[in-house]
C-alpha cells in the first residue's frame, strides 16, 4: 500500500493516523486487496452497517467444536467473548437470533465516528460490537475476538472499487499463508476479479439457502 502526499510541493504531509495496522509489528499484520463490482460508497456503507451481518452472513446452524477450531481468518465463526454461568454463544448464533440490535453512534474526532452495537442475548448477557468509520473511505471492524480489519475503499469508476484490508492480530503472529489462501481462492489473479458476481448470480445455490445460509450465497 503506497500513500501519496498531494498537497503543495514542499509541504509537510500529515502523519498517518494512529491505526492499529500502522503500528503493529509486521509479524502481527497482513494486507490483501480485491475488487468489487460496486460503487466505493456502497462498499464503505455496508462495512459500517452492523445489521447486514444478520442476513448476508447468517448461517442457520452453528458449527461444532472441530469446525470452530478451523475458524481462523473467517468472519463470525469464533465464539463471542465472555460468558455467564457457562453460557457463551457462537457468533453464528448471535447474528442469527438477534437481528434488530440497538445502535449507538458518536463522533470521536472530526471525520471519525464510533458505532456501538448492542445485541441483548438475555438478562445477564449482551453482545457488544465496536466499529469505527474514518471518512471518507475507511472502516475498522472486528474479524474475531483477537483480530481486526482496517479496510479502505478505492474507487476505480462508478461501478468498480478496489478494497484494501489490513488484518491486525492482538494475540500471536498472523498466519499469513492461511489468510492469503482463503482470500485468493475467491478471485482470479492477477486482476483480482471476484469469482462470484452478477455474471453467475453471485454463486446462488438454492440447496445452500434451504439447508445452510439465509441467502444461499455460501461463505
Write out the residue ranges for each language-model feature:
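C-terminal catalytic domain of Rieske-type non-heme iron oxygenases
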Residues: 3-219
